[in-house]
Amino acid sequence: SMHRKGVEAEKYIKEAKEKISAKPEKKFNKLKRIHLLVAEDNDLNYEVEQELLGMYGITCERAANGEICVDKFHRAEPKTYDAILMDMQMPVMDGIDAAKHIRQMDAEGAEIPIIAVTANAFKSDEEHCAEAGMNAHLPKPFDINKLMEVLTSLLDLEYTENENVQ
């Protein structure tokens, strides 16, 4: 039921927040505003991802399937998005096809970091992602700390220490 899903999401977000506040995490330098395009067909998953990213001051925009993702990227002003989080299994167009379309679109499409997010942690999946031109591969459920490491290296970000950590 929707209510139960809501409760699960709350629990998931609460646990994720506790994990983050438990150890003095670093945070992104606010001078660098990060905006992601997130291809995700599941409402609950997107809400959780948006909430977790928001804790790091990262904003995102959703595409509910691969086709919408390709279209949004195509229509956007250059440099609108810093990276794309790409769910693998989506209706209409899956993440692999969407990534291939974006890679072939233009110079920015060829360069933008695309991070695969997938429930299947199989080796063959990683190979398919790499063949489609994706830069990294993260399993679901979404581990925000792993994503931060990946974004930090792909986007060449500076971390600043959290001011409130003694």
Tell me what each language-model feature is.
Residues S1-Q166:
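C-terminal compact regulatory domains
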